[in-house]
Amino acid sequence: MLEIPHLYHLATASEWDADATEPYTVSTLGRSLEEEGFIHLSLARQVAGVAEAFYGDQDVVLLRIDPAKVTARVQFEDVPEAGDAFPHLYGPIPREAIVSATPVPRSADGTLDFTGLLPEPI
């Protein structure tokens, strides 16, 4: 079990399916767990950078995930382009592990605004 309070996943509004009967299996923009081999996750401090790099023009939903309820392996892997290690989930996200699914608003300049959606950086 991970010693962090939450993991995060950015989903496009069109990919987020509120059907709570199936585990969530979208890895990243338009790619499934089956295609990618894992689901891209982030720590709170990584979310805004991922959003800026990949989701700038998308309607986005922030999934907050309880790592204690994730049954598949989570592995932190270096992403040299980002200069950081990101959590990758090698299985689906159980719906019961998703604590919240919150649409991310846009600020006046059009960027995604995570104010109040993420804990303050440590």
Where are these regions (language model features)?
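Conserved, structured core segments of small domains
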Residues: M1-I122
